[in-house]
Amino acid sequence: MPKRDDIKTILVIGSGPIVIGQAAEFDYAGTQACLSLKEEGYRVVLVNSNPATIMTDAEMADKVYIEPITLDFVSRIIRKERPDAILPTLGGQTGLNMAMELSAAGILDECNVEVLGTDLTAIKKAEDREAFRDLMNELGEPVPESDIIHNLDEAYTFVERIGYPVIVRPAYTLGGSGGGICHNEQELIETVTSGLKLSPVTQCLLEKSIAGFKEVEYEVMRDANNNAMVVCNMENIDPVGIHTGDSIVVAPSQTLSDREYQLLRDVSLKIIRALEIEGGCNVQLALDPDSYNYYVIEVNPRVSRSSALASKATGYPIAKLAAKIAVGLTLDEVRNPVTGTTFAHFEPTLDYVVAKIPRFAFDKFEQADRRLGTQMKATGEVMAIGRSWEEALLKAVRSLEIGADHLLLEEAENADEATLERKICFPEDDRLFFLAAALRRGQTIEQLHAKTKIDLFFLYKLSKTIELENRIKENPHNQEILAEAKRAGFSDAFLATCWNVDEQAIYDLRKAQNLFPVYKMVDTCAAEFESTTPYFYSTYEEENESTRSAKESVIVLGSGPIRIGQGVEFDYATVHSVWAIQQAGYEAIIINNNPETVSTDFSISDKLYFEPLTLEDVMHVIEIEQPLGVVVQFGGQTAINLADGLAKRGVKILGTSLEDTDRAENRDAFEKALEILQIPQPAGKTATSVEEAINVATDIGYPVLVRPSYVLGGRAMEIVESEEALKHYMTNAVKVNPKHPVLVDRYVSGQEVEVDAISDGENVLIPGIMEHIERAGVHSGDSIAVYPAQRLSSQVKNTIVDYTTRLATGLNIIGMLNIQYVVDGEEVFVIEVNPRSSRTAPFLSKITEIPMANVATRVILGENLIDLGYTPGLAPEKQEIFVKVPVFSFAKLRSVDTSLGPEMKSTGEVMGKDVTLEKALYKGFVASGTTMHDYGTVLLTVADRDKEEAVELAKRFNRIGFTIMATKGTASTLEEADIPVSQVKKIGENQETLIDYIRNGQVTLVVNTLTTGKRPERDGFQIRRESVENGIPVCTSLDTAEAILRVLESRSFELESMNASEVKQPKARV
């Protein structure tokens, strides 16, 4: 079938901000789709609220709207642009839900807009739990015994009939939001209440638990001619009961017999045909390990996280082809871009094994509930490719960047028996390491299978890895065993530990016997056809398929898995750097291991190496490619941390030298540089022991800001108000020693300002100055950033430009740098300098139209700013106002305190842009998922130090018609200021407490500032958690509350009577 010519303009709906369950895979899918549609000659309009994405670059679509993905704003765009069709299936759950809302509101009919890819009936059948169950029954496909419930009473009725455990699956939610496995009544009440609140249609499916069955996924494609094919099948190592996003996954499946594989394949194809999906679809199935019985768990009628994994695992570009199918092309008439000769209906064949391991953020959240279930908790993932399952697994383990270069974690090895058993029987994020520890202690694979239901095949492979470990230790420097270990995926670092030598000695031993990896191509066809894909993985075999080209090359190091503090912003910069290298006439090579991202799309770079970002793995690529140098500025802390080791091995680090990077990151060297440059910073010193830290804090006075050197995302950073709290921090949060010093600074509570700049060594370009709405003390990644700065005097701006220029030239920065300042009155202090790309670079690049990573890369390659057409100094400010608003995933991370501080907690961001600050903030808040009520009740419960400021906010809330509730202390302060307030009981008091009001939906906004002390049992923690669980916005900074108030005031009309003196209202009490 030829492509459709009756449609000209297509609206693509993006997935919005990065949250747990919906990450960079949709930037990858959306980018591919937009380019694919443009390639076919369509006019593409894109709406997405996330500025940190490649897909929101102006070149990706004919019209790019960075606006909230809400019914109101998308409707406005449709009425303005008049698209002929919308494509919602590449925007994750957000895209699907938006399409359903637009349809229900009558907008699609009103504007005559067609839905492409998957029609609304199919979306409803797949997403609505009841409709899906009915369809499966119609097809004769088994689903677990289940019931649709809309309230708790219906849940009780179901449980009385089938007993515990039961699984709760809310309808139309993302990443299992609000779902879980319930073993008792208490868990049922909590999970069902949460699930019904989070489901936009207030509907949950309760089903009989089939935990323990094998979980298998099929990624399938279908076109309008009813051609359907399987791109890839994947097997979860963890059985049913753990969300697939939190499971270790292998592709292709390893334990299915041919009969089982074909059985589940036929079911998947039958389902996609019955749903009449045109494009990609993910089918999740549960297989009884002891029979051929199976159940259909669910279907995602869209491109998903698994699609991104399947695309990278096979090389088959699902999103690109799904977009072509959506406009009428068929699988047998679209060429597979990997081979260039075969067509897209050929099912990919793999002659290698792929392992995916999720990456969690529990290093950030000590108090989080780490237990895994049906609600997703991972922020990102890594993928590795090998010739065997064990090789792929070990490569994936060292890609995680959790301080493990092997299946060996100190906590697991040192755990007592009770902890070991608990960690094995009740899975958490680190179960793999505890399984290895149990095998080392002599537990059998049969015992572990009985406890975990993990297939014996995988446990057997693990046990073989442990056996090989023992042989390595017993035979130091044995060449045969060394070769066997390398084929099995063992790292030099681990072998060095086993043989008590340094890593270099292992390398020398390998060099002596010419034991090096070769690189194999990912070609979708197991070498059956000629392929030109420049996509490689390493393995220890004979034939090398990657050859160095005659062109000079530059290697760019990626940023690895997405985690809090290092998100998609760094992948954005990596991709732009690659494009700039190509524009400058060099071959651009990427090394990265994240299957979700645009940078690991093989069509982006000249060559892609899908490898762990460790010194050993990166050096192997460098040895084969012999590049001009390596760029580390765009890969976040991951790449920066590799620079030292690479330089010591003679690799040229392009851009800022290692010595100058160290001067910016090492505290003592930085202080000396500031002294020479005569730039002030808050008083502080470096401490290398607990005693030293206490002495420094005593000298400069509390409160102090403490943090380790060389960190990203404010990890382990804290404001400490007493000696007792400092001792607790030094013993619990960091392992302080002379090699890992801790910085102790005077905490300045001023206005925080952030600057990104580019320096060529002589000239410094400052695209923009951003001010943070929250005062210093809240991590920059969690603050609302405003551009252009609204509250800075010309003198302060001039000082910032002067300091930035002096710092860039004084530290010999070549490329990008990010500086954070704190402004106290007219005084400006430097907090920190990061000699690399930052998370604000994509935001600033888009709004100033200065492609920062691109320009910085050209500078790194030796060009200067003036020749590139840029005038040094501060770029002219834009007339419009732009805000970057953080987005959090607290609903997924139970037990995590939502209060904001110096440690970063947000997973993503959105942008708001308009002609006034209030309008831009409104868009930012709405896009971030904050519900903006024009009237309602504000609950105020603030620390003593904030009470004076809270009085002014309360007056303003009262003026625009809000009712105010407060706890005793805050209420007394408000009453003294003659502000009408209802006093509510604190937690633990008799009668209705403020928690009851939150749960009953009687509160629309909570303002709760921290009393010091971080114990979660404190009242504040419970107030904040309850607010999040009940979908109520909660502000832990008065600055954020003031920003929301400004927006509400701008949307309100003041209502005052004409009487000269108003009678004061009586003070109400509740």
From Swiss-Prot:
Q: Which cofactor does it need?
A: Mg(2+); Mn(2+)
Binding locations of Mn(2+) 1: 284, 298
Q: Which SUPFAM superfamilies match?
A: Carbamoyl phosphate synthetase, large subunit connection domain (SSF48108), Glutathione synthetase ATP-binding domain-like (SSF56059), Methylglyoxal synthase-like (SSF52335), PreATP-grasp domain (SSF52440)
Q: Name one Pfam family in it.
A: CPSase_L_D3
Pathway assignment = Amino-acid biosynthesis; L-arginine biosynthesis; carbamoyl phosphate from bicarbonate: step 1/1; Pyrimidine metabolism; UMP biosynthesis via de novo pathway; (S)-dihydroorotate from bicarbonate: step 1/3
User: Which key words are in the record?
Assistant: Amino-acid biosynthesis, Arginine biosynthesis, ATP-binding, Ligase, Magnesium, Manganese, Metal-binding, Nucleotide-binding, Pyrimidine biosynthesis, Repeat
Which residues are involved in binding Mn(2+) 4?
A: 832, 834
Region annotation (Carboxyphosphate synthetic domain) maps to 1-401
Positions annotated to bind Mg(2+) 1 = 284, 298
Which positions does UniProt annotate for Mn(2+) 2 binding? Answer: 298, 300
Q: Which reaction equations make up its catalytic activity?
A: hydrogencarbonate + L-glutamine + 2 ATP + H2O = carbamoyl phosphate + L-glutamate + 2 ADP + phosphate + 2 H(+)
User: Region entry Oligomerization domain: which residue ranges?
Assistant: 402-546
Role according to the record: Large subunit of the glutamine-dependent carbamoyl phosphate synthetase (CPSase). CPSase catalyzes the formation of carbamoyl phosphate from the ammonia moiety of glutamine, carbonate, and phosphate donated by ATP, constituting the first step of 2 biosynthetic pathways, one leading to arginine and/or urea and the other to pyrimidine nucleotides.
What is the name listed in the Swiss-Prot or TrEMBL entry for this protein?
Carbamoyl phosphate synthase large chain
Source organism: Listeria monocytogenes serotype 4a (strain HCC23)
